[in-house]
UniProtKB/Swiss-Prot annotation:
This is Sphingoid long-chain base transporter RSB1. It is found in: Cell membrane. InterPro entries: RTA1. Residues 56-57, 112-135, 193-241, 303-382 are cytoplasmic. It comes from Saccharomyces cerevisiae (strain JAY291). PANTHER family: PROTEIN RTA1-RELATED, SPHINGOID LONG-CHAIN BASE TRANSPORTER RSB1. It comes from the Eukaryota. The chain crosses the membrane at residues 35-55, 58-78, 91-111, 136-156, 172-192, 242-262, 282-302. Glycans are attached at N3, N6. Residues 1-34, 79-90, 157-171, 263-281 are extracellular. Catalyzes the ATP-dependent translocation of sphingoid long-chain bases (LCBs) from the cytoplasmic site toward the extracytoplasmic side of the membrane (flip-flop). Involved in the establishment of the functional lipid asymmetry of the plasma membrane. Regulates intracellular levels of LCBs, sphingolipid precursors that are growth inhibitory at increased levels. Induction: In response to loss of mitochondrial DNA in a transcription factor PDR3-dependent manner. Induced in response to altered glycerophospholipid asymmetry of the plasma membrane in a transcription factor PDR1-dependent manner. Belongs to the lipid-translocating exporter (LTE) (TC 9.A.26.1) family.
Amino acid sequence: MSNATNNTLGSLLPQLEAAANSNSLYGGMVPNLRFNITMIVIWGILLTIHVVQLLMRQYWFSIAFICTGILEVLGFIGRTWSHSNVADMDAFLLNMICLTIAPVFTMGGIYYQLAKLIEVYGHRFSLLPSPMAYSFIFICSDIVSLVVQAVGGGLCGVAVTDGTSTTTGNHVFIAGLAIQVASMAIFLMLWFHFLFRIYISVRWEHINSRPISLSLLKISQTEVDYLYREKFHFLRLEPKRWVFHYFNLAITVAVLTIFTRCCYRLAELVVGWDGYLITHEWYFIILDALMMAIATVTLTIFHPGFAFKGKSTSIPITPGHVDPETLPHTDDVEDILDTSDSKQFDIEKEEFQASMKYPISTFKQFMSKIANLFSSKKKAKL
């Protein structure tokens, strides 16, 4: 009798849980408390590290990471909050919007690094008319993606508050993610083209032949360095500078993991709020949380501030397909070639602040809208 009773209770438990979570915004799934608290701690540590790196190295790329870190912490706070109440819309929106938008800022920072690398290796390796074109095109694309996603999230929030359908907001959100995925796919093609040029094409140029063979790998970077831009040879050749030597690999890992994560998020939203992906947390853990953690830890270790020697070396982004020092010396060119730390550091700061002006402004407006949304909902409840 006891065994029969236990078996009956055991078979009823899943049904009771499903009934209890029938109003779950996660399709019946309850976010794992331990995992989400762990992620809050991990992202809190990463956020602190990047604040310290910004203060110590004064490399402005950390601003992009800091925005990502804030959004990730808020997103996992939302998931932790949802554990105790899976029907709470405030917690769900905090999780969904913050975690979905967070990678936009990391990618904005990464786009800027390709322009830097083209400056280090030489303008002739740029497929676009100018190194800055990479930053301009893809950061603008990120801004569009961020704005569209923010509008979609806002429409969803308003629809929930009014008790109307969130279909329009969902479609707008999906469009924003689709723009981001398409932009990243194009960037990946340009990134691998750049890697092909600096690792394969230069070796072909060095041996004056075009064999497709693993023997090319036997040619060291030192042997072909004369084919790169001479001005920054000290960044490339110093033996102990392992951070720079593996920096391109780190960028590749970061972009591929974030791209994987964005494809997952797009598929999740397309399938729907009660679809298979959103109702099975392991997909989120592996394809979202783990991917973002790998990308951020990788770029924390191989931080651009270390790879490019932080504030001790400035790499101004200059226009054109030709390295500035090869042009006839005019006043404008002399300004570009002036490598005094104070002057070039100011240029570096201004360049990055200009490129991140609109993403940061949008980030502030977005956080303000989230705060206003939650505030208005609480007032309505009262």
